[in-house]
Amino acid sequence: WGGGIMKAEAAAATAKLLQISLKMKKTTMKDIMEFRNSIEIKMTELAAKRATDEQIEIISGHLEKMKNEEYKLDTFAEFDYNFHKSIADASGNSVFSLMMETMRPMLYNHIIYTLNPTFNPEHSNHYHEKILQTIRDRNPEEAVEAMRLHLAGTERIIEELEGVNVTI
């Protein structure tokens, strides 16, 4: 493949095609959680090993936006998605970044669904702070555990809402 522009255009086109395909299927909350559990834990481990100081500051910046937001659900969800996407970028694995970008609309809706009934930014931020700290400390084992706990908490919310089979 050619230069950076061609690669970026190809990645964007691939992401768009996958987004369209996913919209045509009945994707459930359970599907999204299985996806998240399979890639976000590994990408967080890799981010703890590979993230540059600049990438860590980007992750931190998204968390600060979540903490300083006036607690509007839609903007908080966007910052939440950006937090997770920046971890994918910091993993150094371009496939993780592409998959997170591809899943953006579904992940955004997933975040909205899980936050909407009990919107408690402090609870969510607690998990995010721990994840960021483990990446900053360059501790992959603790990063894995922090993300695992975060996703387990999200999964519990979905089960409490009886939303496992809800399609997005």
Residue ranges: model-predicted function:
Residues 1-35, 45, 164-168:
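Short linear motifs at protein or domain termini
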Residues 26, 73, 159-160:
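Glycine-centered secondary-structure boundary/capping sites
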Residues 32-113, 123-134, 142-156:
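Conserved amphipathic alpha-helical segments that form helical-bundle/coiled-coil interaction surfaces
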Residues 116, 120:
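Solvent-exposed loop and edge beta-strand segments that line ligand/cofactor-binding
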Residues 141, 156-168:
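Generic C-terminal helix-cap and adjacent flexible tail
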